[in-house]
Amino acid sequence: MALDQQAKAKIRAEYATVEGDTGSPEVQVAVLTKRIADLTEHLKVHKHDHHSRRGLLLLVGRRRRLLNYVQKRDINRYRSLIERLGLRR
């Protein structure tokens, strides 16, 4: 369940710290959050799709590690990101 280029570009534009920013933790977490939301909706319909469920858990773990990194580096950026994404951490 990959995102199309337009969806990624929209997310990058919203969460980028500078022009052309594709690799900052904020952008990565935002893209992962969108993919997680899409996979969650898929799994509501296809309850027995265990391969996608494993992929979802891997994405959640990757997002958690990135959020831990941001939290250790700059707590204010972390709090801002959590608030903007609407996450419960």
From Swiss-Prot:
Function recorded in the entry: One of the primary rRNA binding proteins, it binds directly to 16S rRNA where it helps nucleate assembly of the platform of the 30S subunit by binding and bridging several RNA helices of the 16S rRNA. Forms an intersubunit bridge (bridge B4) with the 23S rRNA of the 50S subunit in the ribosome.
Swiss-Prot/TrEMBL GO biological process terms: translation
Keywords attached to this entry: Ribonucleoprotein, Ribosomal protein, RNA-binding, rRNA-binding
Organism: Salinispora arenicola (strain CNS-205)
Top-level taxon of origin: Bacteria
Molecular function per GO: rRNA binding; structural constituent of ribosome
Name of protein: Small ribosomal subunit protein uS15
InterPro entries attached to this UniProt entry: Ribosomal_uS15 (IPR000589), Ribosomal_uS15_bac-type (IPR005290), uS15_NS1_RNA-bd_sf (IPR009068)
Family: Belongs to the universal ribosomal protein uS15 family.
A GO cellular component entry from the record: cytosolic small ribosomal subunit
Disulfide bonds: none
Pfam families: Ribosomal_S15
Assembly notes: Part of the 30S ribosomal subunit. Forms a bridge to the 50S subunit in the 70S ribosome, contacting the 23S rRNA.
